[in-house]
Amino acid sequence: AAKLQPKDIKGILILLHIVNVNGFKARTVSVSAEDGKNLNRVFPGDANGTYTDKLAYFIEKEIFSKIDYYIDVHNGDWFEDLTPFIYCVGNAPEETVAEAERMAQAADMPFYVKSQSGKGGAYNYAGTLGIPSVLIERGCNGMWSEEEVAASQKDVKNILRRIGMLKTRPTLAEMQMRVPKHMNHAHYVDSEKAGCWFPKKKAGQIVKAGELLGELKDYFGNVIEEFRLKEDAIILYQTISYSVPENSPLIAYGHYDICIDDMGNTHQHTHDELHKHRKEHYDDHAGIHSREMWEDMI
């Protein structure tokens, strides 16, 4: 909030700093201290429910009813390793999805994922109401850095420019950014049983089809489950804690089936070509958005 000036804003900007304040104070991370529920799993909420249900209900009624766009800024849980990326709504009216994609493409990320969920999460549910929405994912392990904060501030400002809300021209640093590519598919792997988790890869790493992602072992070292990929993919985020409860998230990964070049043309690849092409897309290098995109922003 301190980085923005009212004179530079077109329209009304509503900033929600910490929503689950009690959970933040109690260090319960993704769940509320009062009822153990994840706020990002209960939307649209319930006026007669528990604390978290009521909080979601309040946001849905008092915030979503007043906004035209929604930007959610997140990071990974304390037990998660995560590579930066951005979600946009995919289960929403066609024009809402298209506008959300435009927002996601203004972020300095290697790729964006269209979520097909229409409930539970705040931005997902906002999308079903016709509100173009994105969710920025950056940072993990319950830690933060000045660089990550600055990167998310840069993303928010550029998204605001993209939707015509921020009137300032981008600085040179804000113009130095990657062009995020659409990651067509995202998959989520859960553990069926409780045990000890031994991940073999890291978030952001490219994994070939058939490679071992990790093993779940019992307390005596016996393998309960092992997890392998059926196609080449990149690890979006994964659990890194030793302890894994039953039916809990382990890994999220994504992949392309059609690639888009810098001119916006789509093309198919063979299996080996696709692996090489994905690596080029996933490599953490800085690019610069096209002049046309910046003219659209400013």
Briefly describe each language-model feature range.
Residues 1-298:
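Structured catalytic-domain cores with a bias toward divalent-metal coordination
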